[in-house]
Amino acid sequence: FSFTAWDLGAVRDSVAGVAEFTTQDGARWRMVMDRVQTRDVPHHPRFGGVIMGLYYHGVTGVHTPLVPTINSAVALWSFAHLYRNDVLVTDNAAVHVMLLSHTRREGDFALECWDCSRNKIDEVQLQILPGTGEPKFNAPGGFLFVNWEHSVGAQPAS
């Protein structure tokens, strides 16, 4: 998974990126992000689509308290084109990506902490949901959630 995100304010944020992965059923997925989600929904601000350096979830009062408190180097909300086995599934997938502090325990991937905000930032989470009014994906639960550990981020050269 490789992406670039620009946090340029509430109306100028931008994203570009591609993720490719294979699910347990052998399906090959490709997600291509090319535009941000800017519209906030209740209790879930999107900060113009991209935000850098945000403590949220858990006890922060930002987004859901039902998951650990994390430190996110970058969080973004975008729309994307999604392909399954090279066949277009949707041009309007709703995507949320975070490069965040480590939350998972080695070996079984269970949550390792409730306040994970001081852990090393080395985890990428990718959540892909059907667009509004679209059918569920042909995947367990109807959506995709991919987690990469031991990930790194880099600041682009100015």
Regions found by a protein language model. Give the residues of each.
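Edge beta-strand at a domain terminus
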Residues: R28-T38, Q125-S158
